[in-house]
Amino acid sequence: MTTGTAVLEELRRLSAAEEIFDALEHPYRPEVVNVSRLHIMKRFGQYLAAIDFTPLGAADARAAARDALSRAYTDFVDSSPLEQKVFKVFAKPSRAFVPLTGLSIVED
């Protein structure tokens, strides 16, 4: 295992969002994390997936992970999870719905 991927393994062992923020020494506002925790972590994972950690040393890998966390956190500081549409349920357009009371019989 290279040192770049070792940083990822270290992060995978953490179980709480706050632990990840602390491990990467990234400041955060608890009220933002409490409201958008799952969304921030999902977006963080998306940003991490776009980075090739294999050739990176430990310091560069930690900096890249911190940058990814910073970007994910910033996405939710000034906007809501609904606006960011991280999860499929928010991104998927709702189906058209016509209630039965909205139907009428037209006679010719």
From Swiss-Prot:
It comes from the Bacteria. GO terms for biological process: nitrogen fixation. Keywords: Nitrogen fixation. InterPro entries: NifW. May protect the nitrogenase Fe-Mo protein from oxidative damage. Belongs to the NifW family. Homotrimer; associates with NifD. This is Nitrogenase-stabilizing/protective protein NifW. It comes from Cereibacter sphaeroides (strain ATCC 17025 / ATH 2.4.3).
